[in-house]
Each structure stands twice: as structure tokens, then as C-alpha cells.
Amino acid sequence: MPYFDIDNGRLHYRRLGFGPALLLAFHGYGETADVFTVFEPHLQDKYTILSINLPHHGLSEWPKDTYLQPHHLSTLVAQAATLHGVARISLMGYSIGARVCLALLKAAPDKIDTVLLMAADGLSINPWYYFVTRTLIGRLLFRSFLAFPAASLQLASLLRRAHMISTSYYMLTTQVLQHNATREQLRLAWPCLSRLVYRPEYLRAVISRHSVKLLLFMGSRDRVLPPRLGRNFTNGLNSAHFFVLEKGHRIFDAANAAQIAKHLLQ
């Protein structure tokens, strides 16, 4: 099976297509590299897609309690470019995978051609995520939240009834807390990716300075990452193109993959 060896970890990837240009793709939380197969028929002539399994997802092997750091992403880009024999690459990311793309863009901006992001995380700093992954009190509360799922579900229900969290967040919380495997994945994956958070003004400056083509798709019915985040992020960026699709957070599927892919082919 194909892997990129990154320090003490191994990131598994799936190869899709056979085109001359290289596209690295990063899936959303709780998914695998297989999610991007819907794009293969539309991109395979122009791109070879290396769809990466994030740490603690799919067949990737990553040490527990080890952060995915910016220098790991630089190593990944260098290995992928050498493997494919190219000097520059493009990126595609969905949800938390979009945050990885933005961090990769920050780590190696001179190596990036086009960035396609869908239902993108990382367009703003989420104070709750920062609190539970970057502060001592937050980390302790996060571990307690996962250690006592029954009590945490009751708390989440109260917060939803008090309109302190949305129904979408409540449903996500319920899905995660119901099973040991999903709780363990969250315990490992959320902190692992917490070092890939940057201020949006800094990311915008990198995109502007290097004239990186940014294609950003957000869902009009997305309650997790609403389209206003994308509108605010792209405002004033000359190389950015912003699109709103009539979708929720699951913004792409076999029905609209061609519509999204055509913008990478232009």
C-alpha cells in the first residue's frame, strides 16, 4: 500500500487519475481518502489525485499524542512532488481537510498553483476549538467530555434546548459520543490537527502575496460552517473565486462533482 513516511508517522494515500498535474486532496473529519473518488472521472485526464488519509483516519499510521505540524506538511509536499516529478502542485480539501490545505499553503506557498476548498474549516479561528485543544483547562474538560458520554449527551441536550448550540452541532455530538471508536478517534484527531490554525488575515496575505488561485465552495444550508465565513474570507482577494451551492455541510456528491471540477479545469 502507498504511504508517505513523515517522521515517525505514515500517511496512507489513494491514487486517482493519471493526468500530468498533481492534486493533493484532504478529506473531512471521520471520513477516508475514498470520499474523493466522485471527482476522478472529471479530473483524471488533467490531474493525478493523491487523496491523503489524515492522521487517525483510514489506513494512516500516526503516533498517539503527536501533532501534525507545518514542517510535516512541507515534507509531504516535497515527497509528493518528487514522486510525481513536478515542481508545483494543487490542493483540494473538504471541511477540516480544507484547514490542512490552508496550513499547507502557508508552509509552502511557492509550491502551490490552485487551491479548491469545500465547506472549508480554517477560514476563521473557532474559539471553542482553540480552548479545548490549546489550553490546559480546555484539554481537561475535553477529556472529561469524552470519558463520561452519558452525562455529556445530557449536557448537549440541555444546551440545544437553551439554543446555545445548533441542532447540527447536537447531532454531530450525538454521533461521536455514542461509540467507543468514534470517541477515541476524536480524542486523538482533534488535538493532532490543532497546530494547523492560523489567523485569517495572515492566510489572506499569503494568498495575495503569491497570487494563489483560490476556489472556495460553501453550502447555503451549512449550519456548521456557514457561507458568510467564505464571503468574509474572500472579500478583496483578487485571486479568489467564491461560490455558494444549494447544499448543507455535505457540499459535494456524484451529482455535482462535475460542476465543481470544471473550475479546476479552466
Model regions: which residues?
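Conserved HGGG/HGGXW glycine-rich cap/lid loop of the alpha/beta-hydrolase fold
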Residues: G9, R15-L59
